[in-house]
Amino acid sequence: MAPAMGNELQHRTVLLEEAVNALVTRVDGIYIDGTFGRGGHSRAVLAKLGEAGRLIAFDKDPLAIATAQQVADPRFEIVHESFASLRDAMSERAVGRVSGVLLDLGVSSPQFDDPERGFSFRADGPLDMRMDPTRGESAADWLARATVQEMTEVIRDYGEERFAFQIAKALVARRAESDRLGPLVSTGELAQIVANVVKTREKGKDPATRTFQAIRIHINQELAELQVVLEAALSLLEQGGRLVVISFHSLEDRIVKRFMQTHSSAPAVDRRLPIRAVDLPSPPLKLLGRVFASDEEVAANPRARSAVMRVAERIAP
């Protein structure tokens, strides 16, 4: 049964066929799409499921929710929450185990391309950066109160920016001029402040790239929420169920890789103890490898170049 989607997709879904083929092992299973976006993966999953199958999708973005609400398919449900609420949402729906969890991380192309969302330095817009603009603190609000140390830590840790301290000092110096210049509220001005500090240029990369990524990750608590949803997914997967995660930068991929490796490895045993490795419980996950976008996909969709898809299967009951 193919789902009805009211809107055409506004961007190319990365690793679409590869992700859905890795995810769906039972046509009558219950599946989770942790990031509905504009519905690319969800539509493909629904097309693969039988009449008894079920798909529950999550998203924080009100525009994604509006798109999802046009899906005329009784097997589909959208939840307007972060995927970090996965465990509670399944408990509320009396769902014990699921057959697969798909996470397509990061910001979607429509979010980047809309200057009003504040994610991009390529066009001037309000300094927002929230996945859900109706909740939480915006980037402008945070920059208006954060200390040099707080900014330095965020830009260094989440952007891997070696000029983090200098950028933080420049931002606080700009804040001191707020009475004369007004508050810092635009992406264009933030990008210019960073460019004035970062004199060395990485080939093919805007000097503001790392700082924008860092502030966005902090505002949306992306890495903390990723840790939460990975643990929840592991606890919910049935035996034979799949965890499929697509990441777009090294910080995300590092967390996913470490999580999957940790839960697919037997615990270390002190040889001085009277315990044999065979007496220990088997690890819950089995690694099924990683996948990169093909040359053809990258040529058609340059955003796919940085995508890494990791797949693991639950082998323990």
UniProtKB/Swiss-Prot annotation:
InterPro entries assigned to the protein according to its UniProt record, in alphabetical order: RsmH, SAM-dep_MeTrfase_MraW_recog, SAM-dependent_MTases_sf
UniProt keyword annotations, A-Z: Cytoplasm, Methyltransferase, rRNA processing, S-adenosyl-L-methionine, Transferase
EC numbers, comma separated: 2.1.1.199
Reactions performed catalytically: cytidine(1402) in 16S rRNA + S-adenosyl-L-methionine = N(4)-methylcytidine(1402) in 16S rRNA + S-adenosyl-L-homocysteine + H(+)
Subcellular location: Cytoplasm
A molecular function GO annotation: rRNA (cytosine-N4-)-methyltransferase activity
GO biological process: rRNA base methylation
GO cellular component: cytoplasm
Major location category of this protein: cytoplasm
Disulfide bonds: none
Binding-site residues for S-adenosyl-L-methionine, renumbered to this chain: G39, G40, H41, D59, F83, D104, Q111
EC supergroup of this enzyme: transferase
Family: Belongs to the methyltransferase superfamily. RsmH family.
Protein task: Specifically methylates the N4 position of cytidine in position 1402 (C1402) of 16S rRNA.
Name of the protein in question: Ribosomal RNA small subunit methyltransferase H
Organism the protein comes from: Paraburkholderia phymatum (strain DSM 17167 / CIP 108236 / LMG 21445 / STM815)
